[in-house]
From Swiss-Prot:
Keywords noted in UniProt: Ribonucleoprotein, Ribosomal protein, RNA-binding, rRNA-binding
Pfam families reported for this sequence: Ribosomal_S8 (PF00410)
Keyword RNA-binding: yes
UniProt xrefs under HAMAP family: Ribosomal_uS8_B
Cellular component, GO annotation: ribonucleoprotein complex; ribosome
The protein's assembly and partners: Part of the 30S ribosomal subunit. Contacts proteins S5 and S12.
GO function term, MF aspect, one: rRNA binding
PROSITE patterns, per database record: RIBOSOMAL_S8
Organism: Streptococcus agalactiae serotype Ia (strain ATCC 27591 / A909 / CDC SS700)
Function: One of the primary rRNA binding proteins, it binds directly to 16S rRNA central domain where it helps coordinate assembly of the platform of the 30S subunit.
Keyword Transcription found: no
Protein name per the record: Small ribosomal subunit protein uS8
Family: Belongs to the universal ribosomal protein uS8 family.
Disulfide bridge partners, by residue number: none
Length: 132
């Protein structure tokens, strides 16, 4: 079966593992998933990200992060631009997620960026997801 939206699948796997309080999540690797995982690590939503090479496409291992009392760091993830309805925005109209408490992941001509980085670099692009 062909997967029509690997980004939505990746976000759903993170959401499900987070709800079940798993420590580690493994997903099939791709460049876009690696970029999203790196942004999540840089912004402090996950502990660590490892890429494991194998004979096929590789595996991304994401180490989820929780607070001291076991509360989830990632409250929710939402896919915005979908294969059936793409969502593009200019840098002036870049959305702020929960007034800056969350991030938007944007695919730009300069690669994957957060909404804040895209605003600073004055580049727009496709809004892939909101994470808060």
């Amino acid at each position: 079966m062909v997967m029509t939206d690997p980004i939505a699948d990746f976000l759903t796997r993170i959401r499900n593992a987070n709800q079940a309080k798993h420590e580690v999540l493994e997903v099939p690797a791709s460049n876009i998933k690696k970029g999203i995982a790196d942004i999540l690590k840089r912004e402090g939503f996950v502990k660590n990200v490892e890429v494991i090479e194998d004979d096929k496409q590789g595996i991304i291992r994401v180490f989820l992060k929780y607070g001291q009392n076991g509360e989830r760091v990632i409250t929710n993830l939402k896919r915005i631009s979908k294969p059936g309805l793409r969502v593009y925005t200019k840098h002036e109209d870049m959305p702020k997620v929960l007034n800056g408490l969350g991030i938007a992941i944007v695919s730009t001509s300069e690669g994957l960026l957060t909404d804040k980085e895209a605003r600073q670099k004055n580049v727009g692009g496709e809004v892939l997801a909101y994470i808060w």
